[in-house]
Amino acid sequence: MERGVSYYLWIPFKFIHQTFGSLLLKLLGLRSPSDHSFPEDGEEEVKVVEVSSRGLPGKKNVLKKSRESSGKPGGTNKKPF
């Protein structure tokens, strides 16, 4: 190994601990203390909400710009003589 070069090995200890704990739980039927921190499949509460675009009110009061506008600010829309 060259001088100044070092190699690091990252070991996911928490993942390994949870994996072995779940294997022991399945094999031996024992409850481990780590079970209290994570909910099981049956304990997780899920709320399902159905959303539909048809339930939304449509835009009925849409302001339309008059075609007779001159485009200048401050004026009223009057027909030219």
Swiss-Prot record:
Keyword Transferase: no
Domain of life: Eukaryota
Residues the record marks as site: Required for ligand-receptor interaction: G71
Residues excised as propeptide: 1-54
GO biological process, one term: innate immune response
InterPro entries, per database record: PEP
Keyword Signal set for record: no
Role, per record: Elicitor of plant defense.
Family according to the record: Belongs to the brassicaceae elicitor peptide family.
Lineage per the UniProt record: Eukaryota, Viridiplantae, Streptophyta, Embryophyta, Tracheophyta
Keywords, in A-Z order: Plant defense
Stretches for region Disordered: 57-81
Pfam family, one: Pep1_7
Name used for this protein in its record: Elicitor peptide 4
